C-alpha cells in the first residue's frame, strides 16, 4: 500500500508495483478506465480508436495481475446514485439543489476549487467512477476473500495524470481506496520494459468477482457520455424506455432540453475551461438555467487525457471518441443502463443496500472536496 503518487517517477512506480505483485499475502486488483482501451494500441502500432479491451486485460495478466476490473462498473454506480439524487430533488421541488455539476473530472474540479469556490458547493458529492471502483474493489474483495482491506492492493490504469492526485481524496468513512495510479503511457512503458508486446499477448477477461459493466458506463470516457448515461438511467428508473443519444457529437458545448416522464430537464455537456467560463457566465447572469452540467477538462473528454499516448491531434481524438462510442455499444447485450447490469445488482444486494443508503454514502461519497 502506498501514499506516494509517483508523479514523473515511472521506474520507481514499476518497482513498487512489482514488489506488491510478488508479495504472496497481497491480492492485487487493477481497474481499466474506458478511454485507455481505445488509445493504448497507438503505442504498439494499432490505429487510433481500436477497442483493445481484452488485449489490455491480457497485457495486465502478463504483467502479473490476476484480477482486472472495468472502471465503467464504478461509472454505473456513480450514475445510478446521481440519477436517484436528482430525481429525489425534482420530486421535492428543491430548486436550490440545482444546477449540479459532475464530480468525474479531477482536472476541472482542481480548476474550480481555485477559480470558482461557490461553484464547488454544487459539485456532486458522489465520488468519481475511478474512486468508486477503488472503494468497491477494496470492500468487495476483502469480504469475498476474508482478507483485511490493507492486503487488497488497488491499482488503476488511467488516461489522466491528475488521477494520481485524486487517489489521495478521502471518502465519507475517512479512507482512501486507490493505492497506485498508472497512466496509459506508463503502462505501455512498463510493458515494453518487460519485453511485452500488446499484439502478441493473449486476450484476457475481467475478474469473475466483478465481471460486468454497462453500455452507459463505458461511454463516460468521451464528452457527452456522462449526460447520455444520466438521462437514460433516469428514464429507465421512471419506466420510460428512452436513450439520450443526441450527445454523441463532438461540439465543445452541447446544450439540450430533454423531457423524461413528467420532468423537463435542461442539461449541458462542456469540454475545456474556456467553454465552461462562457456557460458559467450565462448561469450566473440568469440567462441559462440547468439541472445538470457535465464538465470535462480535456478535448473530447478522457480520450484526450494528459496520460494518453503522444503525439495527438484532432483526427486522433475523433478516432478515439468514435471508437469508444462503438465499444460502449458492444455492451448492449449485457446492459444498457446500470440497473440492468448483473454486477451492479449484486453489489447493491450484497454490499451497498440501495441508492442513497447510509452504506452507499459511506462507501461511494466523498468526505470533503479539499483540492
PLM feature spans:
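Iron-sulfur-associated redox domains of electron-transfer enzymes in respiratory
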Residues: 5-371
Amino acid at each position: 500500500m502506498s501514499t506516494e503518487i509517483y508523479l514523473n517517477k515511472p521506474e520507481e512506480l514499476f518497482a513498487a508495483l512489482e514488489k506488491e505483485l510478488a508479495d504472496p499475502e497481497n491480492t492485487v486488483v487493477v481497474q481499466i478506465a474506458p478511454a485507455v482501451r481505445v488509445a493504448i494500441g497507438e503505442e504498439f502500432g494499432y490505429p487510433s480508436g481500436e477497442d483493445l479491451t481484452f488485449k489490455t486485460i491480457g497485457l495486465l495478466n502478463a504483467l502479473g495481475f490476476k484480477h482486472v476490473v472495468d472502471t465503467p462498473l464504478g461509472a454505473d454506480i456513480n450514475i445510478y446514485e446521481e440519477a436517484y439524487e436528482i430525481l429525489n430533488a425534482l420530486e421535492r421541488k428543491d430548486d436550490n439543489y440545482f444546477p449540479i455539476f459532475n464530480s468525474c473530472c479531477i482536472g476541472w474540479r482542481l480548476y474550480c476549487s481555485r477559480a470558482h469556490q461557490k461553484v464547488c458547493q454544487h459539485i456532486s458529492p458522489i465520488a468519481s467512477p475511478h474512486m468508486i471502483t477503488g472503494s468497491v474493489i477494496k470492500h468487495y474483495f476483502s469480504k469475498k476473500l476474508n482478507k483485511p482491506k490493507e492486503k487488497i492492493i488497488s491499482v488503476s490504469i488511467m488516461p489522466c495524470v491528475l488521477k494520481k492526485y485524486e487517489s489521495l481524496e478521502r471518502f465519507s468513512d475517512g479512507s482512501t481506496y486507490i493505492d497506485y495510479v498508472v497512466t496509459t503511457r506508463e503502462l505501455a512503458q512498463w510493458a515494453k520494459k518487460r519485453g511485452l508486446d500488446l499484439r502478441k499477448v493473449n486476450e484476457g477477461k475481467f475478474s469473475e468477482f466483478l465481471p460486468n459493466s454497462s453500455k452507459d458506463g463505458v461511454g463516460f470516457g468521451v464528452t457527452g457520455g456522462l449526460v447520455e448515461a444520466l438521462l437514460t438511467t433516469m428514464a429507465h428508473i421512471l419506466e420510460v424506455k428512452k436513450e439520450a443519444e443526441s450527445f454523441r457529437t463532438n461540439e465543445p458545448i452541447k446544450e439540450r432540453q430533454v423531457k423524461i416522464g413528467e420532468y423537463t430537464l435542461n442539461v449541458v455537456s462542456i469540454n475545456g475551461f474556456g467553454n465552461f467560463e462562457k456557460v458559467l457566465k450565462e448561469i450566473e447572469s440568469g440567462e441559462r438555467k440547468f439541472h445538470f452540467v457535465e464538465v470535462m477538462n480535456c478535448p473530447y473528454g478522457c480520450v484526450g487525457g494528459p496520460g494518453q499516448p503522444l503525439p495527438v491531434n484532432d483526427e486522433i481524438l475523433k478516432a478515439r471518441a468514435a471508437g469508444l462510442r462503438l465499444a460502449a455499444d458492444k455492451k448492449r447485450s449485457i446492459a444498457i443502463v446500470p440497473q440492468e447490469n448483473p454486477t451492479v445488482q449484486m453489489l447493491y444486494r450484497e454490499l451497498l443496500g440501495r441508492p442513497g443508503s447510509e452504506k452507499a454514502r459511506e462507501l461511494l461519497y466523498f468526505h470533503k472536496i479539499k483540492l
